[in-house]
């Protein structure tokens, strides 16, 4: 497996991202160890919050949520998935599988020995994080899903998703910053768009971002479907606190909270919300998300 590592110079002077880098080696199956980057802010002995990003972003997406969460006494950790941010980037699309992503993040949890975690997930962070919650529930104390879901090839896949999948596969460029701008209610300033572009000096660094859309299980014969269906069954027994905060302006996932709230026992009686935000809800409403999380945690 050939691997690229984005030069550190690409991450200098980013708008609103003053966090020191941290690294740990992770593994998946028989793959070589890869270096995963993560933010680690707040007191080391504080109650841990883990923030998982998705496509095509990185921990930069959480830059407005990390300060208020850590200031409230939490240890806030935000990893960059393999292929994204400051983490290592295998160069072939075929190097990335759904299972490997789950195993890489699981390895990160294990190496940091994280327990009693409040796990916040969005986009592909939910596809990975909900699997981890179902398979390693002893590590997770609370779940928050924002504009996410757990696909198991049941029901119809929205047409806009297939448009996005085709774009990611065939477009000669994959402009992360512009894509984030397209998926928000508010215009994203140029300096912030540059922050999303920083991990990808050129297209050779983008195999992970190209791979993600095609890894979403949309047919029953997808290799990820059995594990996802087992995870969905396990979530049907999840009685720990579960919160859904969705941006209703998201054209693909804006109403995907309903099945989660109905299925997960721990969702009963929680202050779920749909707010004026689009797919990248952290970019639209990061401060509000942090405030809602903190008040909810105090109550649970």
Swiss-Prot record:
<protein>
    <recommendedName>
        <fullName>Haloalkane dehalogenase 1</fullName>
        <ecNumber>3.8.1.5</ecNumber>
    </recommendedName>
</protein>
<dbReference type="GO" id="GO:0005886">
    <property type="term" value="C:plasma membrane"/>
</dbReference>
<dbReference type="InterPro" id="IPR029058">
    <property type="entry name" value="AB_hydrolase_fold"/>
</dbReference>
<comment type="function">
    <text>Catalyzes hydrolytic cleavage of carbon-halogen bonds in halogenated aliphatic compounds, leading to the formation of the corresponding primary alcohols, halide ions and protons.</text>
</comment>
<dbReference type="GO" id="GO:0009274">
    <property type="term" value="C:peptidoglycan-based cell wall"/>
</dbReference>
<dbReference type="InterPro" id="IPR000073">
    <property type="entry name" value="AB_hydrolase_1"/>
</dbReference>
<comment type="subunit">
    <text>Monomer.</text>
</comment>
<dbReference type="InterPro" id="IPR023489">
    <property type="entry name" value="Haloalkane_dehalogenase_1"/>
</dbReference>
<feature type="active site" description="Nucleophile">
    <location>
        <position position="123"/>
    </location>
</feature>
<comment type="similarity">
    <text>Belongs to the haloalkane dehalogenase family. Type 1 subfamily.</text>
</comment>
<dbReference type="Pfam" id="PF00561">
    <property type="entry name" value="Abhydrolase_1"/>
</dbReference>
<feature type="active site" description="Proton acceptor">
    <location>
        <position position="279"/>
    </location>
</feature>
<dbReference type="InterPro" id="IPR000639">
    <property type="entry name" value="Epox_hydrolase-like"/>
</dbReference>
<dbReference type="GO" id="GO:0016787">
    <property type="term" value="F:hydrolase activity"/>
</dbReference>
<dbReference type="InterPro" id="IPR051340">
    <property type="entry name" value="Haloalkane_dehalogenase"/>
</dbReference>
<dbReference type="GO" id="GO:0018786">
    <property type="term" value="F:haloalkane dehalogenase activity"/>
</dbReference>
<keyword id="KW-0378">Hydrolase</keyword>
<feature type="domain" description="AB hydrolase-1">
    <location>
        <begin position="47"/>
        <end position="176"/>
    </location>
</feature>
<feature type="active site" description="Proton donor">
    <location>
        <position position="250"/>
    </location>
</feature>
């Amino acid at each position: 497996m050939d691997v690229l590592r984005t030069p550190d110079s690409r991450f200098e002077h980013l708008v609103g991202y003053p966090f020191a880098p941290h690294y740990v080696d992770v593994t998946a199956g028989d793959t070589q160890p890869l270096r995963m980057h993560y933010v680690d802010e707040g007191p080391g002995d504080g109650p841990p919050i883990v923030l998982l990003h998705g496509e095509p972003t990185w921990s930069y997406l959480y830059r407005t949520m990390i300060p208020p969460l850590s200031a409230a006494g939490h240890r806030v950790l935000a990893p960059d998935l393999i292929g994204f941010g400051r983490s290592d980037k295998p160069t072939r699309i075929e190097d990335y599988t759904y299972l490997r992503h789950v195993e890489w993040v699981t390895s990160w949890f294990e190496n940091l020995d994280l327990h009693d975690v409040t796990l916040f997930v969005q986009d592909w962070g939910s596809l990975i994080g909900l699997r981890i919650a179902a398979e390693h529930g002893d590590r997770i104390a609370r779940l928050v899903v924002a504009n996410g879901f757990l696909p198991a090839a049941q029901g119809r896949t929205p047409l806009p998703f297939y448009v996005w999948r085709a774009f990611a596969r065939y477009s000669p460029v994959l402009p992360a910053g512009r894509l984030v701008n397209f998926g928000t209610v508010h215009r994203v300033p140029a300096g912030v768009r540059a922050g999303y572009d920083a991990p990808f000096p050129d297209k050779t660094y983008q195999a992970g971002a190209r791979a993600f859309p095609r890894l979403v299980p949309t047919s029953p014969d997808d290799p990820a479907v059995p594990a996802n269906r087992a995870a969905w069954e396990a979530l049907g027994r999840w009685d720990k606190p579960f919160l859904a905060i969705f941006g209703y302006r998201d054209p693909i996932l804006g109403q995907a909270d309903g099945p989660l709230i109905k299925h997960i026992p721990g969702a009963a009686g929680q202050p779920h919300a749909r707010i004026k935000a689009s797919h990248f809800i952290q970019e639209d409403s990061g401060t509000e998300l942090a405030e809602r999380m903190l008040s909810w945690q105090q109550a649970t």
